[in-house]
From Swiss-Prot:
Induction behaviour: Down-regulated by estrogen treatment.
InterPro entries xrefs: MEDAG/TEX26
Protein name: Mesenteric estrogen-dependent adipogenesis protein
Chief location: cytoplasm
Disulfide bond sites: none
Chain's role: Involved in processes that promote adipocyte differentiation, lipid accumulation, and glucose uptake in mature adipocytes.
Organism annotation: Mus musculus
GO biological process: one example: positive regulation of fat cell differentiation
Any one GO CC term of the record: cytoplasm
Length: 303
């Protein structure tokens, strides 16, 4: 298909990242990302493992957790290839907090690692096909971190001493990423909520639901789907770098992001890949969306 024919249907959110971009990053310059859960399991066996009827994720007290990893948000179950698996360790999508110490611990915990949410996707053309995706939120990227921190700060300043409920929602950005005709079966999985219950005698705003707020988080979504062995190795390194333990730099010049990862990204991404090649392939290749596939192939050639 000609380039001109692709331009009207090209979508800004359908973004691929080139190998050249990966090699030049200071740290993981990724706001949001999507990839099949099956691919994530293969690329990050230290962080996610299927064992029997469980999807094992290192918990806070396990040695693997000290080396970084991800914060999985969920309700305890994930469906992969038609089978239900129990999550061994996860952060509940709804929590209640009753004091400042709980709030502080919760805030530090959710921002300490990249977030992971699991969703199931179908197409209207073939509802018999269902695929499970992992949605990644890079909490060390300044744009994403700022939206979460500002949301938490603003609600506190507006309800001083009172109870409130705050939800962070990624449904809109994910649904806009997929092409038309795609059905996200469990979109509610793309949000998490905490409720702070203050010991207030008269909590009128809370009683009448006037202190409930929702922050719709927005950002650029990267498609990390790939079947190319060389590109998958690059994505693996990319994910490992994103999930490294966080350390704070003492020098302002070293702190390009509010919190940075350990080590130098340049050492990790010196891969022998063409600077013009694309790391990703069409997100829904098996669902056959011709306009999407052709446009992504064309855009990759133009990078």
């Amino acid at each position: 298909m000609a380039t001109a024919a692709c331009e009207p249907v090209a979508r800004p959110s359908l973004t691929s990242i080139s190998s050249g971009e990966l090699r030049s990053l200071w740290t993981c310059d990724c706001e949001l990302a999507l990839l099949p859960l099956s691919q994530l399991l293969r690329l990050q066996p230290g962080a996610f493992q299927l064992r029997g009827e469980q999807l094992l994720v290192p918990g806070p007290g396990e040695p693997a957790a000290a080396r970084g990893g991800f914060n999985v948000f969920g309700d305890g179950l994930v469906r992969l290839e038609g089978q239900l698996y129990r999550l061994s360790s996860y952060i509940k999508r709804y929590v209640e907090l009753t004091n400042y110490c709980d709030y502080k611990d919760y805030r530090e915990t959710i921002l300490s690692k990249p977030m992971v949410f699991f969703i199931n996707v179908q197409t209207k053309k073939d509802i018999s096909k269902e695929r499970t995706y992992a949605f990644l939120v890079n909490t060390r990227h300044p744009k994403i971190r700022r939206q979460i921190e500002q949301g938490m700060d603003m609600v506190i300043s507006s309800v001083i001493g009172e109870s409130y409920r705050l939800q962070f929602d990624f449904q809109e950005v994910v649904k806009n990423f997929f092409p038309p005709g795609t059905i996200v079966l469990n979109g509610e999985n793309l949000s998490f909520t905490y409720e702070f219950k203050a010991d207030a005698l008269f909590d009128f705003f809370y009683w009448f639901g006037l202190s409930n707020s929702t922050v719709k988080v927005h950002g650029k979504v990267l498609n990390l789907t790939s079947t190319n062995p060389e590109k998958k190795e690059t994505i693996k390194l990319f994910l490992e770098k994103m999930s490294e333990p966080l350390i704070r730099r003492s020098s302002f010049s070293d702190r390009k992001f509010s919190v940075t990862s350990r080590g130098s990204i340049d050492d990790v991404f010196n891969c022998n890949l063409s600077p013009r090649s694309s790391v990703t392939e069409p997100l829904l290749a098996e669902f056959s969306f011709p306009s999407l596939l052709e446009c992504e192939e064309t855009s990759s050639q133009l990078i």
